[in-house]
Amino acid sequence: MLVVVSDTHSSEDHRLRGRTLTAVREADTVVHVGDFYREAVLDAFEAEARTLRAVYGNNDDAAIRDRVPKARTVEYAGVRFAVTHRHRGGDTGLVMFGRERGADAVIYGHSHTPRFDGSTALPLINPGSHAQPRGNRPAHAEIEPAGAADAGGEGDAAGELIGRLVTPDSEVFEEFRLGR
């Protein structure tokens, strides 16, 4: 499973709890979309995740900016994700960012608003914030191969992924599909 979190905004720890903490510990890969805030928080995520792929956000200190890039590409189960904290130009700018990187979808943060939009030229995924939702639901995203839950983690070979926006209390409030 690929787990996506963003906008922790903490000085000391990862602020993970409930299903979000469990998902981070069980994930094959965790993508953090920036705004850890302080280096100790990045360290805390590295201690919990098997594999952490992160980008820095506009509120991250210099120590974080020295350790992780501003943008990156992550491949999972044959699907390529362009990852950034934020990008100028709204949805169009995010789609252009993804196309420049040959991505199948774009993962971004910054707004603290959990969102999936499949109506754009490339699907856009924002996990929201598990720790500082700012009037939204606290959330993270879980993405796995279609059929993985039914096939004991095997999934299918067609490159289709199923995603969910989930609260720390295990409420799945949006499901979506992605493909190559």
Summary of predicted features, one role per range:
Residues V5-H14, R19, A23-H32, F36-P133:
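Conserved catalytic scaffold of divalent metal-dependent phosphoesterases
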Residues R101-G102, I125-R180:
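Binuclear metal-dependent phosphoesterase catalytic core
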Residues M1-V3:
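Extreme N-terminal starter segment of soluble prokaryotic enzymes
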